[in-house]
Amino acid sequence: MSFTPGKQSSSRASFGNRSGNGILKWADQSDQSRNVQTRGRRAQPKQTATSQLPSGGNVVPYYSWFSGITQFQKGKEFEFAEGQGVPIAPGVPATEAKGYWYRHNRRSFKTADGNQRQLLPRWYFYYLGTGPHAKDQYGTDIDGVFWVASNQADVNTPADILDRDPSSDEAIPTRFPPGTVLPQGYYIEGSGRSAPNSRSTSRASSRASSAGSRSRANSGNRTPTSGVTPDMADQIASLVLAKLGKDATKPQQVTKQTAKEIRQKILNKPRQKRSPNKQCTVQQCFGKRGPNQNFGGGEMLKLGTSDPQFPILAELAPTAGAFFFGSRLELAKVQNLSGNLDEPQKDVYELRYNGAIRFDSTLSGFETIMKVLNENLNAYQQQDGMMNMSPKPQRQRGQKNGQGENDNISVAAPKSRVQQNKSRELTAEDISLLKKMDEPYTEDTSEI
């Protein structure tokens, strides 16, 4: 006796479109003999073995008894643990729970920029001895096929399951026994379609998402589900990011223009609401360090709250309640130094506060906190002292160390005796010349 999934062995009759029995109608199974309203949409052609896809993708020549499992993350393998992976079907005993999952490579679509993008594949289940690989033995290594069977099933014989006739047999939403682990990066299709349609990708995606949510909700009201379906919100978000070509785990690259926009956005906030980071430093947010702003030095001034040591300091920061109720507050009116003289002057006030944060050595991370505080409190004084120190004389290239204090003395040419201005005793010749210089000048009138 052959078994029909979704029907008890005592009753093999078809009851048409049933509701509330855990079975969904395929979206393209329109009864041509009845007057069915299409709500303004054209009737979709029925998928057959000879159907061709215009944009690539292989054809699903056989109808699966169950809704598919769609991949939404690239690089994830489709696999089940041993003894798992066979969907639950009323009327099918555990001895017949054997078969394989068949990978359907879906069609591609054109993006807004004109590029072709391939949809991720969808997997469908077929009982052993049915479907596109009906003649293959269980466990045969075939690309795009994953074999599954329950522990009670004999995989050496085909399953005694009839092929599904879409005109009379309805598709069953895929559900698994409790404890089944769904492959990571996949979700169960709730629309109940075993073949792709010719509608646009955006309409198909939105309809599949909404229909999937409804089918899972209805399934939960009928019978307890196995808990193997991942969170649909995360799935849809990851699927949308994959459609847009973005990776949720990839960090965003910060360009100069982006950094400028972030810095301007921070500076537009009130002073007490700013949070310095790599794009907007401490000095840009709050000014230079000094007696009234004496915290921060080194890397912390550059990184601000992005510094790896900052989170442990943030544990000491008071809450809003502690700030207002645990501090001494004073309201003072100050001079408005901003704006032009032609503009109306605004009244500016300062809420001045004075308080303390008390902690002891039992605080978690006490030693690290003390180390960070000692490195950053009044660090500006050390930096100013280093800037005021005279620069160390640099050694000339080619000179060796240990030459003494005369290393930096320039060597000039030796001076003459006149330049040296050294005194010496007059000689007899010098005295004779001096006497001649003292005698009066007389003109020589002798004739030659």
Curated annotation (Swiss-Prot):
Modification Phosphothreonine occurs at: T174, T427
Region (Dimerization): 266-384
InterPro entries associated with the record: N_prot_C_CoV (IPR044344), N_prot_N_CoV (IPR044345), NCAP_bCoV (IPR043505), Nucleocap_CoV (IPR001218), Nucleocapsid_C (IPR037179), Nucleocapsid_N (IPR037195)
Spans annotated as RNA-binding: 52-194
Entry-annotated residues carrying Phosphoserine: S167, S191, S390, S423
Post-translational modification, as annotated: ADP-ribosylated. The ADP-ribosylation is retained in the virion during infection.
Biased composition (Low complexity): 193-223
Domain of life per record: Viruses
Function per UniProt: Packages the positive strand viral genome RNA into a helical ribonucleocapsid (RNP) and plays a fundamental role during virion assembly through its interactions with the viral genome and membrane protein M. Plays an important role in enhancing the efficiency of subgenomic viral RNA transcription as well as viral replication.
Assembly mode: Homooligomer. Both monomeric and oligomeric forms interact with RNA. Interacts with protein M. Interacts with NSP3; this interaction serves to tether the genome to the newly translated replicase-transcriptase complex at a very early stage of infection.
Name this protein carries in UniProt: Nucleoprotein
Native species: Bovine coronavirus (strain Mebus)
